[in-house]
Amino acid sequence: MTVRFHAAALAVTMATALAHVPGAMANTAAPSVEELIALALDRSPSLEAVEARLAAAREMVAPAGALPNPMAETILQNIGLDDYTVGSVDMSMLSIEVRQDLLWPGKRTAARDRATAQAEVEAARLELARRTLTAQVRVTYARLYAADRERQTLVAADELLDMLAETVAARYAAGESEQEAVIKAQLEGSRVAEQLDDLLAERSRMVASLNRLLDQPGGAPLGEVAQLPPATFPEGSWEVLAESNGPDVAVAARAVEEAARRLEVARLEAKPNLSAGAGLGYRGDLDPALILRFGVEIPFWREEKQKPAIRAAERELAMAEAELRDAVAVARAEAARLVAEREQADRQLLRYREAIVPQTSAAVDAARASYLAGRGDFSTVIENFELWLEARAELARRESDRFAVWAQLEALVAPAPAPEGDAE
C-alpha cells in the first residue's frame, strides 16, 4: 500500500467519521429556561390536577358550615282507630310542621375552619408542585446545556483530529512512523463519532423528559442550549431559610393546623345538637292549633362514638406534629447537602477553568510537537487528546451541576408567594 493511499484514506476517515452520526441538531437556539418554565406552569397536567384539587377544597368551605336542610312534615293525629275524629275531638288534628336541626354553638364555625385549613393544605401542595416542576425544568435545561457543550467539543475535535491526521501522514510519508499510528488515528475518529452518537441519543431522552413536563409531543425538537442564566445564591444560613421557606415544611405545617381543627371539630361533636320546629294543626270546625317544638340531642352513645373519635383526632394531631418535625429535619439536611455540593462545584469549576483545561491543551500541543519531531510516541498524542476531550466535557458538566444546585436551592428556600387576594 502506497504512502499516498495511506494519507488519503486517513483524511477520508477523519472527514467522514462524524458525518455518519444520526440525529444531527439544527443550528437553532433553545428558548430561555424562564420561557420553558412559564410554558410548563401553564401546560402541566400534573399541576392542573393539583389546582383542581385546591379549587374543589375551596368550594367545600361554605358547605362545611351550612345548616342541615329543614324538614317538612305532615301529621295526622286521630283519636281512635274506628272513626275519623278531626274536628270532633279536641286532640285530633291534621298538622303541617317545619323542623330545623340546629348545631351546638361553635360547631359551624369549627367546621368552616377545618375546611379552610384543608384548603390551605392543598394550596401548600400546589406551591410544592410548582416549585418541583420549576426545579425539574431548570435541572433538565442544565443537563441539556452540558450535553450541547460536549457535542460542540466533539464536533470541534474533528478539526483537531484533522491536525493529528496531517501529523501522522507527514511522519508516515517520511518513513518515520509505522502503520499503527495511522490506524490509531482512524480509530480515534471512529470513537469520537461513537461518543457523539451516544451523546445525541442521551440528549433525545432528556428532551423527551422535558417535553413531558411541557405537555407536548415527546419528539418535539429543542434547539441548542447555548448558555445558562446566572445563578445567584442567597445570603445567610440556607438551613434557616429552608426551615422557614421550604415547601414541604409548609405542607406539613398546614397539615398540623388542619389536624388541630379536626380535633376541635371532634371535641365539639360531643356536644348535643338541637332542633326546633313550628307548625299549624287543622281541627275542622275547632280553632287551629299552633305547634312549637324544641329538642336536644341526647349523646347516649358518647363513649362508643364521640370519645373514640376525639382520641383518634388527638393521635392524628400528634402524627402531624411529628411529620412537621421530620419535614424540618429533611429540609435542613437538604440545605446542608446543597451547601456541600455548591462548594464542591465552585472548587471544581475553578480547578477546571484555571488548571485542567489549559493543561490538557498544552499537553496535546506538546505531545504533537514531540511526535512530529520524532521524540514522542503517537499513543501519548492520543492519550492527551482524550484528556483534552474529557476536560472540556467535564467543565460543562461542572457548570451544569452548579446551576442544578441553584435550581434545587431555589425550590427549597425561595420566599413563599403572598396569599391570593393580599395587596401590597
Language-model segments: which ranges?
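Acidic, low-complexity, intrinsically disordered peripheral segments
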Residues: 25-30, 392-424
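Hydrophobic, lipid-facing positions within transmembrane beta-strands of outer-membrane proteins
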Residues: 92-98, 238, 274, 278, ...
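Bacterial Sec-pathway N-terminal export signals of envelope proteins
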Residues: 23-76, 101-102, 110, 116, ...
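A glycine-/polar-enriched beta->alpha junction
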Residues: 38-48, 55-70, 85-88, 96-113, ...
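Periplasmic alpha-helical coiled-coil/stalk elements that build and connect Gram-negative outer-membrane
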Residues: 2, 31, 129-244, 338-341, ...
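Amphipathic alpha-helical coiled-coil segments
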Residues: 49-61, 129, 133-154, 163-170, ...
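Bacterial N-terminal signal peptides
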Residues: 9-20
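Transmembrane beta-barrel strands of outer-membrane/channel proteins
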Residues: 72-78, 276-282
